[in-house]
A protein has these predicted regions:
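Alpha-helix N-cap and loop-to-helix initiation/capping positions
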Residues: 33-40, 65-72, 102-110
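Non-cysteine beta-strand/loop elements that form the S-adenosyl-L-methionine
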Residues: 10-26, 80-92
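A short acidic, helix-capping loop that chelates divalent metal ions and anchors anionic groups
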Residues: 26-32, 94-99
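Auxiliary Fe-S-binding modules of radical SAM enzymes
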Residues: 78-185
Length: 185
């Protein structure tokens, strides 16, 4: 969470876009976060937008939320109208609160449906497949490009990922071309 003065300093320094995910729906949020409320998160996003930041705002699927929670989260994201919507799929990591989370419901079909739903519900935003891409879409990754605008590569906040060269090769083999937004390898 940023104070207005901190956000203003970042904007004045040249920062244009900020990622501030909702992570889940309003009703499920207390199950995953105890440091601040959903409304504080929404208000922080509104403040950042009022300063002129482009927003990257998405969520994490597979933390125990219901299908209705996914829809509710996407409805709130649609209201925010971010430039970019990263959809992450839970990667349970040993030593974290969600390490033992049951992810058996995160089938390829379900995960693809979530991305399609994001595309339909937030049509003006770039839909991005982020964490979990290599796990949940193994063998069908090229299919993602029929639904999403971009994918993440080379790792995530808490887990490694497919390297950029392998990702670019996969994109090329699928008959697409790719651009790298960040030169950090």
């Amino acid at each position: 969470m940023l104070f207005r003065s901190q956000a203003r300093m970042l904007k004045d320094a040249g920062l244009n876009r900020i990622n501030h995910n909702l992570n889940s729906s309003r009703s499920y949020y207390p199950n995953i976060c105890s440091t601040h409320t959903y409304d504080q998160r929404i208000n922080n996003i509104r403040m950042l937008k009022s300063i002129g930041f482009e927003m990257c705002c998405g969520g994490i699927i597979g933390m125990g939320e219901s299908k209705s929670d996914v829809v509710d989260m996407l409805m709130d994201i649609r209201e925010i109208n971010p430039e970019s919507v990263p959809i992450n799929f839970l990667l349970p990591i040993k030593g974290t609160r969600l390490a033992d989370r049951d992810i058996s419901g995160l089938t390829q079909q379900y995960c693809l449906k979530v991305l399609c739903l994001a595309r339909l519900m937030v049509p003006k935003s770039d839909i991005r497949c982020a964490a979990g891409r290599e796990v949940y879409f193994k063998g069908i990754e090229p299919t993602l490009f029929k639904v999403v605008d971009s994918i993440f590569a080379s790792g995530y906040l808490t887990a490694g990922g497919q390297g950029i060269d392998d990702t670019l090769n996969m994109i090329k083999e699928a008959g697409f071309t790719g651009e790298i937004e960040s030169t950090d390898r």
